[in-house]
């Protein structure tokens, strides 16, 4: 065959040939082709698309050039220069709110509700008006519009908190939050340390608590209490007797309204908040947080997530995490500078699910304890093996999409399995963020699949204004806390006594950036412990760099102790492993320098224990099971199994446990207000059980 004949043999058909061929096809065949083409086009147009990651997710942080101590920065940044501000016109909390007024076009700002009622909203300009009235009222009462003027704020989350806070910021005053879970002694300490002469309280009961301090001559500096709710004349008289003026928030507003003072906004370097952190030992420490600290941390979040999320006036935040902590403060700052709405819960955590259904938030910040409850409740309702299998199967299918970067809530599995879960949160959540404590990878991964929204995990502490690391859009894997935020550097330093070496990519997490605090109020000794001479914040957490440039928190430097044979023990690491047991709600691992082994006090999970025990042929009430020696042995065996799977060394495993039926709590003095274990108090509380275990266990 000639070459030209070969070409002619393989030539593409002419268009006229195709037309003639199509004309010969039956109508049904043509309709089938058309339907197939339409379906293909529809699939292509509506197929789930992966979120665009802001950088190469296989290398989310990079080492700073020319350094020898392993300093790393976010790969989101174009160079080694850290982000300071995201918006040029937002450099203080005051600026952020003013931007919110503009971009919202004076839209709704703060919302609250009464029982069984819808949310009622006040606009951005109404908030600004009330804030200026309150600030002017304070000035009329003799308070100075400067960053040396501290104003106490003792309240649950509610619109008045933001209004009072903005009133302070409008005149460069500094907010000092108080919260009742601190306890009376700690509140007295803070009032004196910050020399608070005026405190805003939401309820008369809190005003009475404050008055007790003055009456007992413990807080002589306190002169004015402003109360948000209504109160009786007896409280006014009681205040007069000890030299404290009791005034309503409305009266202070009215005073400022007729004595208006032009705002005196703060500078970025001015103090904004003195956030007292509850330590596990000693008095609270007052972290001095500037406007720049807060705006810088907000800017870091916005920059890290901008490829997939930018808050807008359509967004609604549910405010229930304490505003006395920096996590919620930073989240609300991000919302306000974008003109979004903030709806407050009714003040009762038991009504939160009802508030969520009514408010239908799009932004939902959470803490691990709430996530664990959600996870347990979901699987608790899946009371048959078939239901559990379906949940697990659907979750695995959506987890495969997550690994491809796809986040959605409209898949077949969402419609069949997860719709009710999503509806329980209002049905419109598009972003969740968790922080403040470690969260189980199992829990986080499942809820990411079930809730079908962008779900970020952050890491930080009060001293770096809430966050210093954050997971990035597109990386929905669990088991790490993300990469350094674009506003700060992170490095690891050696902790030789625990065998963590920076050269091996492990060590104490240290942070440096414009989000790092200025020190502790009137406490140079503890400031020097936290901040070194080069401005690095030493967190006390042990981290490990993963191959993709993310950070994994693996241990805690504090609370380490030696056993008799000289081995170092980090009890919190062991506790976090043991908490993976289905039967366990809380665990306290204890060791002593004169003893060669560890023991633990375990509080079983009141909801999970009965079914867990039944699978092992054991029955009884919760209290009976807690006293059952067979349950004790079964729980111990489960803990040891988990420890072995997690790679604990033999000396890191407990040799015996005491089962205790009552949860460690703030009320019984065994947890701090931020739900961290008070180890000295736990040691004293369980001294008899500890002594008995050491006396009876022979190794």
Swiss-Prot record:
Q: Record's SUPFAM superfamilies?
A: Acetyl-CoA synthetase-like
Per its Swiss-Prot or TrEMBL entry, what cofactor is needed? Answer: Mg(2+)
Superkingdom per UniProt: Eukaryota
Q: Which residues carry this modification: Phosphoserine?
A: 621
Tell me what reaction this enzyme catalyses. a long-chain fatty acid + ATP + CoA = a long-chain fatty acyl-CoA + AMP + diphosphate; (5Z,8Z,11Z,14Z)-eicosatetraenoate + ATP + CoA = (5Z,8Z,11Z,14Z)-eicosatetraenoyl-CoA + AMP + diphosphate; 3,7,11,15-tetramethylhexadecanoate + ATP + CoA = phytanoyl-CoA + AMP + diphosphate; hexadecanoate + ATP + CoA = hexadecanoyl-CoA + AMP + diphosphate
Q: Which residues carry this modification: 3'-nitrotyrosine?
A: 9, 86
Q: Does the keyword Nucleotide-binding apply?
A: yes
Give the EC number(s) under which this enzyme is classified.
6.2.1.3, 6.2.1.15, 6.2.1.24
Q: Which GO terms describe its cellular component?
A: endoplasmic reticulum; endoplasmic reticulum membrane; mitochondrial outer membrane; mitochondrion; peroxisomal membrane
Membrane topology designation: Single-pass type III membrane protein
For the biological process aspect of GO, one term held by this record is:
long-chain fatty acid metabolic process
Q: Which residues are glycosylated?
A: 136
* Annotated positions of the N6-acetyllysine modification: 208, 357, 387, 633
Record localization = Mitochondrion outer membrane; Peroxisome membrane; Microsome membrane; Endoplasmic reticulum membrane
Q: How is its activity regulated?
A: Inhibited at high temperature and by arachidonate.
In the UniProt record, does the keyword Acyltransferase occur? no
GO terms assigned for molecular function: arachidonate-CoA ligase activity; ATP binding; long-chain fatty acid-CoA ligase activity; oleoyl-CoA ligase activity; palmitoyl-CoA ligase activity; phytanate-CoA ligase activity; pristanate-CoA ligase activity; protein serine/threonine kinase activator activity
Residue numbers carrying N-acetylmethionine: 1
Q: Which UniProt keywords apply?
A: Acetylation, ATP-binding, Endoplasmic reticulum, Fatty acid metabolism, Glycoprotein, Ligase, Lipid metabolism, Magnesium, Membrane, Microsome, Mitochondrion, Mitochondrion outer membrane, Nitration, Nucleotide-binding, Peroxisome, Phosphoprotein, Signal-anchor, Transmembrane, Transmembrane helix
Which residue ranges does UniProt annotate as crossing the membrane? 25-45
> Which positions does the record annotate as the modified residue Phosphotyrosine?
85
The record places the following residue ranges in the Cytoplasmic compartment, namely 46-699
Q: Which InterPro entries match?
A: AMP-binding_CS (IPR020845), AMP-dep_synth/lig_dom (IPR000873), ANL_N_sf (IPR042099), LC-FACS_euk (IPR045311)
What functional role does this protein have?
Catalyzes the conversion of long-chain fatty acids to their active form acyl-CoAs for both synthesis of cellular lipids, and degradation via beta-oxidation. Preferentially uses palmitoleate, oleate and linoleate. Preferentially activates arachidonate than epoxyeicosatrienoic acids (EETs) or hydroxyeicosatrienoic acids (HETEs).
The family classification in the record reads:
Belongs to the ATP-dependent AMP-binding enzyme family.
What's the protein name?
Long-chain-fatty-acid--CoA ligase 1
Species of origin: Mus musculus
């Amino acid at each position: 065959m000639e070459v030209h004949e070969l070409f002619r043999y393989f030539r593409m058909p002419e268009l006229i040939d195709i037309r003639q061929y199509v004309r010969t096809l039956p109508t049904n065949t043509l309709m089938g082709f058309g339907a197939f083409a339409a379906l293909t086009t529809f699939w292509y147009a509506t197929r789930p698309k992966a979120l665009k990651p802001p950088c190469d997710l296989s290398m989310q942080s990079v080492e700073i050039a020319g350094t020898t101590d392993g300093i790393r920065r976010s790969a989101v940044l174009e160079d080694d220069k850290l982000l300071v501000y995201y918006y040029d016109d937002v450099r203080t909390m005051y600026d952020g709110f003013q931007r919110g007024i503009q971009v919202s076009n004076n839209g709704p700002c703060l919302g609250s509700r009464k029982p069984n009622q819808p949310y009622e909203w006040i606009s951005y300009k109404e908030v600004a008006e009330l804030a200026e009235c309150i600030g002017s009222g304070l000035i009329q009462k003799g308070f100075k519009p400067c960053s040396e003027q501290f104003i106490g704020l003792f309240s649950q989350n509610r619109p008045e908190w933001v209004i009072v806070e903005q009133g302070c910021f409008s005149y460069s005053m500094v907010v000092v939050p108080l919260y009742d879970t601190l306890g009376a002694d700690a509140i007295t300490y803070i009032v004196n340390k910050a020399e608070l002469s005026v405190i805003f309280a939401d309820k008369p009961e809190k005003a009475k608590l404050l008055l007790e301090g003055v009456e007992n001559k413990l807080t002589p500096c306190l002169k004015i209490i402003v109360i948000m709710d209504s109160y009786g004349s007896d409280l006014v008289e009681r205040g007069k007797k000890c030299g404290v003026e009791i005034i309503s928030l409305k009266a202070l507003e009215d005073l400022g309204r007729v004595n208006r003072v032009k705002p005196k906004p703060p500078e970025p370097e001015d103090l904004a908040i003195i956030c007292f952190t509850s330590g596990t030992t000693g008095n609270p420490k007052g972290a001095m947080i500037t406007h720049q600290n807060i705006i810088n941390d907000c800017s870091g979040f916005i920059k890290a997530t901008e490829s997939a999320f930018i808050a807008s006036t359509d967004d609604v935040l549910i405010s229930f995490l304490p505003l006395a902590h920096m996590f919620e403060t930073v989240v609300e700052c991000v919302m306000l500078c974008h003109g979004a709405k903030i709806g407050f819960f009714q003040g009762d955590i038991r009504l939160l699910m009802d508030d969520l259904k009514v408010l239908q938030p799009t932004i939902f910040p959470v803490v691990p304890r709430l996530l664990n409850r959600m996870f347990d409740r979901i699987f608790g309702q899946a009371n048959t093996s078939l239901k559990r299998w379906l949940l697990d199967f659907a979750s695995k299918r959506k987890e495969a999409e997550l690994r491809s970067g796809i986040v959605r809530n409209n898949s077949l599995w969402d419609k069949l399995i997860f719709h009710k879960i999503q509806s329980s949160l209002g049905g419109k959540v598009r972003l969740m963020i968790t922080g403040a404590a470690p969260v189980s990878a199992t829990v986080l991964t499942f809820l990411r699949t079930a809730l079908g929204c962008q779900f970020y995990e952050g890491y930080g502490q009060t001293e770096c204004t809430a966050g210093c690391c954050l997971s990035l859009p597109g990386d929905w894997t669990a088991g790490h806390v993300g990469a350094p935020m674009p506003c700060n550097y992170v490095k690891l330093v050696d902790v030789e006594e625990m065998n963590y070496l920076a050269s091996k990519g492990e060590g104490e997490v240290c942070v440096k950036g414009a989000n790092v605090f200025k020190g502790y109020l009137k406490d140079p000794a503890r400031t020097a412990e936290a901040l070194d001479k080069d401005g690095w914040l030493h967190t006390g957490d042990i981290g490990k760099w993963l191959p993709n440039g993310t950070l994994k928190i693996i241990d805690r430097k504090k609370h380490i102790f030696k056993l008799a044979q000289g081995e170092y023990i980090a009890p919190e690491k062991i506790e976090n492993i043991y908490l993976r047991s289905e039967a366990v709600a809380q665990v306290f691992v204890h060791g002593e320098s004169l003893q060669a082994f560890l023991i633990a006090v375990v509080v079983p999970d009141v909801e999970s224990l009965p079914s867990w025990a039944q699978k092992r042929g054991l029955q009884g009430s919760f209290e009976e099971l807690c006293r059952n020696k067979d349950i004790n042995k079964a729980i111990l065996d489960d803990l040891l199994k988990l420890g072995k799977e997690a790679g604990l060394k033999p000396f890191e495993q407990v040799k015996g446990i005491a089962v205790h039926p009552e949860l460690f709590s703030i009320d019984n003095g065994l947890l701090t207000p931020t739900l961290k274990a008070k180890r000295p108090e736990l040691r004293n509380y369980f001294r008899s059980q500890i002594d008995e275990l050491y006396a009876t266990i022979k190794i």
